[in-house]
Regions:
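Transmembrane beta-strand segments that form the barrel wall of outer-membrane beta-barrel proteins
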Residues: 28-35, 57-68, 88-96, 103-105, ...
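Residues that define the transmembrane beta-barrel architecture of outer-membrane proteins
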Residues: 23-25, 43-47, 71-75, 114-120, ...
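Cleavable N-terminal export/targeting peptides
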Residues: 1-24
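Short loop/turn motifs that connect adjacent beta-strands in outer-membrane beta-barrel proteins
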Residues: 21-24, 89, 128-130, 166-174, ...
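Outer-membrane beta-barrel initiation region
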Residues: 21-54
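Detector for outer-membrane/organellar transmembrane beta-barrel domains
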Residues: 108-185
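Outer membrane beta-barrel transmembrane domains
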Residues: 175-209
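Outer-membrane beta-barrel "beta-signal"
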Residues: 201, 205-207, 227-239
Length: 239
């Protein structure tokens, strides 16, 4: 865990060696009927605030998912660095349900206590092809359950997601995702090394105005492994 944070610190410190550039700051607020994530429904109607700070090829984002009924909240951080058609991310996810009986401690990262999960992400999206592929691996916060009820080693649960898409206009994108669980992880209750867990069709359109944009989105998701499906829609504002 310490090595992970040291690596993040090194990346942040590297900003000082970059050529003088302006910081880019942006924000958005969206609301969706359901929070659909990697073949599962995390909560119902919710709001998603997001703040993004960019400098050169570095981007730091903070965003959350807060359900209207107060049952679910999630606070996420994502630090990314872009090189050509690749981007590399370190992310931290913090999620809690109101039904949790343990006291909340945002600053705990101990096994069996933390509600944080850290993830390493690699994305490839060629500019000349309507295709993208992303690899996600939990590096801390997700452990393999043992037969005696204790937690074992880190699961390194991974998720592979290819995407093909069509741009009707620069503001209209239709995407088809196929997500797979790689290695035993929570996506399959730690029972399968491989499973298709997410088939999603998503359409997203932006309405442009002088100083802001309004995103509109509709998604249909199927989880072949769980034999479940959901439909969701959302709207927001970007500034």
């Amino acid at each position: 865990m310490k090595k992970l944070f040291i690596s993040v610190l090194v990346v942040l410190c590297s900003i000082t060696s970059m050529d003088a550039q302006k910081f880019n700051v942006s924000g958005s607020i969206e609301t969706h009927a359901s929070y659909l994530w990697r073949g599962s429904k995390e909560c119902g109607t919710h709001v998603v605030p997001c703040l993004s700070l960019g400098y050169g090829n570095l981007t730091l984002q903070s965003y959350g998912f807060i359900s209207f009924d107060g049952d679910y909240k999630e606070i996420d951080w994502d630090l990314s660095y872009s090189v050509g058609e690749f981007s590399f991310h370190l992310a931290d996810y913090y999620a809690r349900l109101s039904s949790y009986t343990t006291p909340e401690n945002y600053f705990s990262f101990r096994k069996g206590e933390t509600n944080h999960i850290q993830e390493a992400i690699i994305c490839y999206e060629p500019q000349k092809l309507p295709f993208a592929i992303r690899w996600f691996t939990f590096v801390h916060g997700d452990w393999l359950p043992q037969d005696d009820g204790t937690l074992g080693r880190a699961s390194f649960s991974s998720y592979l997601e290819p995407e093909i898409y069509h741009m009707f206009t620069p503001n209209s994108r239709l995407s088809l995702f196929c997500g797979a669980s790689i290695f035993k992880g929570g996506y399959t209750s730690y029972t399968r090394d491989f499973a298709i867990i997410n088939l999603e069709l998503r359409y997203r359109h932006h309405l442009d105005f002088d100083h802001f944009r309004i995103p509109l989105q509709i998604s249909y998701m199927i989880n072949p492994y769980r034999k479940t499906s959901w439909l969701s829609a959302g709207v927001g504002i970007e500034f």
